[in-house]
Regions:
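N-terminal glycine-rich phosphate-binding loop for ADP-containing cofactors
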Residues: 1-411
């Protein structure tokens, strides 16, 4: 017998930037929210930050005083998991460490009522590995919010191997209630958005070693219509997030593509928040300023790694970044991680600043045509190696004269 799930009482674990945004999303949508963090001082600071955000919204005329007070009143700090027993939904929003998340889910599984749904805000970790430590894997899923969560509209809803259809339906209803654009993704490393971001960012980073400079790569992509290029994006998000994740996992720090990032982080240049990353920022400013010190660093790293440098045209920068996105998107589509190409486009239009006029990476690729796409990928494979091997789906579409938009997997 299928069970229906309705979310009235929610809870959030984690009082960092993501936790704060998620709490506001839930409170803004009319849910009562309990909030827990292992550091009471951090939780108090986060409550203050939420109050400040609501006060700012009142000053801006976005909401009235009464509505701000009502939203604040829906948020209740708690000191232990037992206080969350009656929650219908708990969203974990701690930092990206699988063992930590598994530990939290074990405790939640033991403490919460049997009907509660457990969600992780992980941006790339294995949802099935998290669900496996509970006795309720059918009631575990990913709810990947994008930062800042109370502003960004995209929500990736990640279905695990055992996630019940009714749980997915409840999550979609919650997304609609919060005013989100929701996309259901299958479980894999990075899901849809961040899995595709990895080869895109890798190409951008490798082009630095081969002869391009950060401002040049960003300029080419912004001229195409991206809200910001990859290096400006990493400055906003924080260069140190991936750096710390690599350190924690003990994997990937020796890859040539991340050596400029590593040097920047070792210098304390974490991005906008530290006043310097790939760009410089004046005190209190978000305006990115070209920094010749970073250009010199790129040249030193490339020389140390033995990369011969050459001139780059904007067209090559654009092609390598876009085709990296599309080739990975084709694999995601073929594997059933995304049900349709339009879902991939929705993710990139609403979460990654892809130009709306282009319709998303897969729509852009369909206009190019599968045969042309395959030809360009084969050229890049010959020139740069196996990472450019065309996705099997692209080969099939080229042979059949088909398009990504023709494909749709019934769910």
């Amino acid at each position: 017998m299928s069970q229906n799930f309705s979310f009235r009482q929610a809870a959030v674990i984690g009082a960092g930037t993501m936790g704060r945004g998620i709490v506001m999303c839930l409170a803004n949508a009319g849910l009562d929210v309990q909030w827990l963090d292992s550091n009471p001082q951090m939780l108090n600071q986060a409550l203050g930050a939420v109050a400040d955000t609501y006060a700012h919204n009142v000053r801006q005329g976005r909401i009235g005083e009464e509505e701000a007070a009502a939203r604040r009143a829906r948020i209740t700090p708690v000191q232990h998991l037992a206080a969350m027993r009656e929650a219908d939904l708990v969203i974990e929003a701690v930092y990206e460490n699988l063992e930590l998340k598994q530990s939290i889910f074990r405790e939640l599984d033991a403490a919460l009522k049997p009907s509660a749904v457990l969600a992780s805000n992980t941006s790339y970790l294995d949802i099935d590995a998290i669900a496996a430590v509970t006795a309720r894997p059918r009631q575990v899923l990913g709810l990947h919010f994008f930062s800042p969560a109370h502003i960004m509209r995209l929500l990736e809803i990640v279905r695990g191997a055992q996630t019940a259809p009714a749980v997915l339906e409840a999550a979609l209803a919650l997304g609609e209630r919060m005013g989100k654009v929701s996309v259901v993704a299958g479980n894999c490393h990075g899901f849809i958005g961040n899995r595709m971001l990895e080869p895109y960012a890798t190409e951008a980073r490798l082009m630095l070693l081969e002869g391009a400079l950060p401002y040049q790569v960003d300029r080419a992509l912004q001229a195409f219509g991206f809200a910001m290029g990859p290096f400006r994006m990493y400055d906003v998000v924080g260069i140190d997030l991936e750096w710390r994740a690599r350190e924690l996992a003990g994997v990937g720090q020796d890859q040539p593509a991340v050596q400029v990032d590593n040097r920047l982080c070792e210098m304390g240049r974490f991005g906008q928040k530290s006043g310097a990353g790939y760009y410089r920022y004046a005190p209190g400013s978000r305006q990115a300023e070209h920094d010749t010190e970073v250009d010199a660093l790129v040249l030193r790293v490339a020389e140390t790694l033995g990369y011969p440098r050459r001139d780059f045209a904007d067209e090559e920068i654009l092609e390598r970044c876009l085709l990296a996105l599309v080739n990975e998107g084709a694999k995601i589509l073929d594997e059933g991680i995304a049900a349709r190409s339009a879902d991939i486009d929705t993710v990139y239009l609403n979460g990654y600043g892809f130009p709306a006029a282009e319709g998303g990476p897969m729509a852009w690729a369909d206009r190019l045509g599968a045969a042309e796409l395959l030809q360009r990928l084969r050229f890049l494979e010959q020139r740069h190696g196996a990472r450019w091997k065309p996705a099997s789906l692209i080969e099939r579409l080229a042979a059949e004269g088909g398009a990504f938009a023709d494909l749709q997997e019934a769910r």
